[in-house]
């Protein structure tokens, strides 16, 4: 298996029927890429069937050409007529499989079992994109094979019969619930797609909100979004330097027998130290 890094700040998608675009995925230096057999491929049996060998071969070539890159395939939803045939595209060399529109923990367990039966012990990136999926987010993420989850705002809003607005108030509750469930289960949460492709300020504002809600990375649908995602997700070198200095100060205080100490004008407590340790753990 091509193991993904501990932190996925950016996950860049490409259509599974476009080998030319898949080959270009590493150019923008995302942390992970997804070869998409679901939304990016027309919803006909003929189109899905034609995309599978393209996606399979493109994934193989991408893994060989960019061994540092985490490569995923997104299959169609479990209860779609395409799901089982999509499994033929998967190989053990992938970093994981993206399963959209999961709605119950039992569905995630069923997917994991089907993968195991095919000798494909791949971790799952679970898509929570419906009212039921958000409602049952925690039980889905408690399935051991689920390592990451993403919130899909567009499908969620459609499922509820709502409407997307520039401010995103209509998805704030669900977006927060997915982030909370991820925190409680130790799963990494990936934030929503920004469909405005030529509007970096809109992307930045959305990424800033996602980071504030607790998301650790962002789904990207254009190469230009990758660098923007990296601005907001994951520690900067300044963040790392400050964390190291804080832990050094804590060690020095402990040597002096001081349980409490201040750092840069702030009293330090254990949650601050834990946050610094977590930040530096992503360097591994």
UniProtKB/Swiss-Prot annotation:
Disulfide bonds, paired cysteine numbers: none
GO MF annotation, one: magnesium ion binding
Keyword Lyase tagged: yes
Keyword field: Lyase, Magnesium, Metal-binding
Cofactor list: Mg(2+)
Binding site for substrate: 74, 129
A GO biological process held by the record: oxaloacetate metabolic process
Enzyme class: lyase
Entry's EC annotation: 4.1.-.-
Domain of life: Bacteria
Binding residues annotated for Mg(2+), in chain numbering: 129, 155
Cofactor remark: Binds 1 Mg(2+) ion per subunit.
Its biological purpose: May play a role in fatty acid biosynthesis.
Assembly notes: Homotrimer.
Similarity comment: family membership: Belongs to the HpcH/HpaI aldolase family. Citrate lyase beta subunit-like subfamily.
Protein's name according to its UniProt entry: Citrate lyase subunit beta-like protein
């Amino acid at each position: 298996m091509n193991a993904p890094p501990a932190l996925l700040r950016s996950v860049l998608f490409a259509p599974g029927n476009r080998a030319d675009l898949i080959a270009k995925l590493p150019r923008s230096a995302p942390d992970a890429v997804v070869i998409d057999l679901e939304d990016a491929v027309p919803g006909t049996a003929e189109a899905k069937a034609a995309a599978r060998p393209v996606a399979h071969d493109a994934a193989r070539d991408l893994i060989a050409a960019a061994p540092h890159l985490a490569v995923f395939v997104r299959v169609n939803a479990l209860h779609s007529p395409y799901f089982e045939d999509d499994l033929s595209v998967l190989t053990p060399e992938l970093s994981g499989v993206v399963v959209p529109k999961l709605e119950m923990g039992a569905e995630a367990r069923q997917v994991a079992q089907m993968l195991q039966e095919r000798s494909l012990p791949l971790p799952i990136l679970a898509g929570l994109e419906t009212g039921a999926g958000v409602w049952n987010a925690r039980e889905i993420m408690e399935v051991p094979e689920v390592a990451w989850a993403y919130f899909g705002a567009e499908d969620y809003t459609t499922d509820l019969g709502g409407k997307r607005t520039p401010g995103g108030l209509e998805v704030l509750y669900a977006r927060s619930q997915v982030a909370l469930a991820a925190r409680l289960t130790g799963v990494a949460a990936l934030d929503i797609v920004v469909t405005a492709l030529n509007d970096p300020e809109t992307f930045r504002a959305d990424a800033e909100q996602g980071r504030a809600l607790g998301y650790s990375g962002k789904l990207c649908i254009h190469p230009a979004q990758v660098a923007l995602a990296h601005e907001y997700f994951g520690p900067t070198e300044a963040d790392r330097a400050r964390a190291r200095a804080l832990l050094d100060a804590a060690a020095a205080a402990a040597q002096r027998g001081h349980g409490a100490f201040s750092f840069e004008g702030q009293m330090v407590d254990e949650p601050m130290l834990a946050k610094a340790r977590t930040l530096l753990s992503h360097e591994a």
